A protein has these predicted regions:
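N-terminal targeting or regulatory segments adjacent to alpha/beta-hydrolase or S9 domains
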Residues: 1-2
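Alpha/beta-hydrolase superfamily serine-hydrolase fold, recognizing
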Residues: 6-271
């Protein structure tokens, strides 16, 4: 389905940016933008779906929660035409673009949902491994961190998950992103990587989604390795329930929590 161009509210500029292999859009306030931080939003879609208008709505929410920070949303390349490492390469190019504009790593907050949440963690691992500045924080909503689909919740929530449950034909099991690469490669499935040196992370997940263990296991592993992590499991919630925006109590609470997390990062307080 082709969506019409997203028209931002009157208070915003939405600027298109052409990169070598993909495009990005920068959402910024027309008046008095906050340049203390910037949010790099990596969209979900199972590494097979392009950016959708919903993510520009997300960008507006992130702008509000961050007290007016700019939000950069890349439309990174996706499978099957562009399998791994295309998405990671484009996420890295987006991050480097922000560095070239004068932002320090600690001023950049990575935010992503589903595949985008996993991609945010993979990007952070790559940055650390290549001695580049890591971001100041990560917000991950229902992150997909285990493309082997081997976690406990893939079985326990199989009949509960309204989006991915009761079938082996979903993109969880039928996904072209890894290509010929090992699905346990940490840059594909961050769960199997090392989280040492990561910034603080906020991880939100629904209790009935098959990807529950992706979040729980990452949070436990990262904490063991000295990372500050806030894991919030929302009872009865489904995959990326934050797409309900402010229309249901749980989503409203999750967005408020994301705003509080950003405030914590800005004041450099304890999680």
């Amino acid at each position: 389905m082709i969506e019409p161009p997203w028209i931002p509210p009157a208070m915003f500029n939405l600027t298109g940016i052409n990169m070598d292999h993909f495009t990005m859009k920068l959402l910024s306030l027309k008046e008095n933008p906050n340049t203390d931080y910037v949010i790099l939003q990596l969209h979900g879609g199972g590494y097979t779906g392009a950016v959708r208008n919903a993510y520009y709505v997300f960008a507006g929410l992130y702008n509000e929660l961050s007290h007016g920070c700019n939000v950069l949303t890349p439309d990174y390349r996706v499978a099957p035409e562009n399998p791994y490492p295309a998405a990671l390469e484009d996420a890295l190019a987006s991050y480097r673009w922000l560095l070239s504009k004068g932002y320090y790593g600690e001023q950049i907050i990575l935010a992503g949902d589903s595949a985008g949440g996993g991609l945010a963690m993979a990007l952070c691992m790559y940055l650390r491994d290549h001695n580049m500045p890591v971001p100041g924080g990560i917000i991950a909503m229902s992150p997909w961190t285990d493309l082997t689909a081997s976690g406990e919740s893939y079985e326990t929530n199989y009949e509960k998950d309204p989006l991915f449950g009761n079938t082996k034909e979903s993109l969880i099991y039928q996904n072209d992103y890894p290509g010929e690469h090992d699905r346990m490669d940490p840059y594909i499935s961050p769960l199997f990587g090392d989280f040492r040196g990561f910034p603080p992370m906020l991880i939100q997940v629904g209790s009935i989604e098959m990807l529950l263990s992706d979040s729980v296991s990452v949070a436990a592993k990262a904490r063991e390795q000295g990372v500050k992590v806030r894991l919030s499991v929302y009872e009865g919630m489904f995959h990326v329930f934050q797409m309900a925006y402010l229309n249901i109590p749980e989503s409203k609470k999750a967005w408020a929590e994301a705003g509080k997390f950003i405030d914590v990062l800005r004041t450099d307080s304890r999680l």
